[in-house]
Amino acid sequence: MITEPRWKSYIVETTTPIFTPKQCQMIINAGRNEPKKNAEVGSSQGIKGGVYDTKTRTSHISWIPFKKMSYMYKDIERIMKTTNGNHFGFDGMTITEMAQYTEYPEGGFYDWHTDNDVDMRHEPPVRKISMT
C-alpha cells in the first residue's frame, strides 16, 4: 500500500487572499522603497557571509521594516497564529524576521534550496512556520 508522506500533513495553505490588491500594491511599494541589493546565497538579513551566485539565484531583495508596515505584520501574525492553533500547537509563536521583498528580472530565478547555515557560523532562527 502506498501512502502519502507524513510531512505532507504539515503543509497548510490558504486559498483566500490575505491582502486586497490595494494592500498588495502598498507592500510592493514598501519593498521597492527600501534599499535593494543583489540577492546572495548563504547570507541572512544583512549578516555578512553570502556570495553572489548567478547559478543558484538571480534576483534583487530588500527587507520591509516592522514599523513601516505594521498592519501587514499584524495581518500575517493573525493568520500565522490561527494556522498554528488549528494545525500545530506551538507555544509562543511570533514573527521574528522582517519580510523579504524579492524582485526577479526577466529570466531571474532562485533554485531549490534550504534556509540554513551549513557552516553554523551564525545561530539561525528557529523557524517553526514559514510563510510565502
Regions found by a protein language model. Name each.
Residues 1-130:
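Fe(II)/2-oxoglutarate oxygenase catalytic core
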